[in-house]
Amino acid sequence: MKCVVVDMRNRLFGDAISGSLQHFDVGFRVYQTEGTAAEDLCVDTHADVLVAEVTAYPPWRLEQRLDLCRRLRQGLPGCRVALVVDEVCEPQLADQVRRAKKDGLIDGFFYSSVSSDYLSAMIDAL
């Protein structure tokens, strides 16, 4: 069973992602957190995947998320990091996230407009 930590600024969106993952047919153990607690929760649960929202506001800024990804790769090398960004409201940020994936700084990314089934399947494949 894959352990997934969900760290979203928008609690409603986080609940929707968590619910979708929990109902996915392969099964996930899903934990939700916010901001600076994400790293501790990933370590405590031996997370396989961190799904984290990126916004223009701290502590969800891209630079902070990339720092978190670096720390997780050092302390929990098996944990994959996938970022979620709103490509409609934040097109420049979405482009920066896409480049971070191309540069190997993160393991994956999703636009907030993707379906919950697609998101679940891609997280399972990470």
Task: Map each language-model feature to its residues.
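Proline-centered flexible-loop/turn and helix-kink motifs
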Residues: 26, 74-77
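Conserved acidic carboxylate
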Residues: 7-8
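Output/docking surface of receiver
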Residues: 86-125
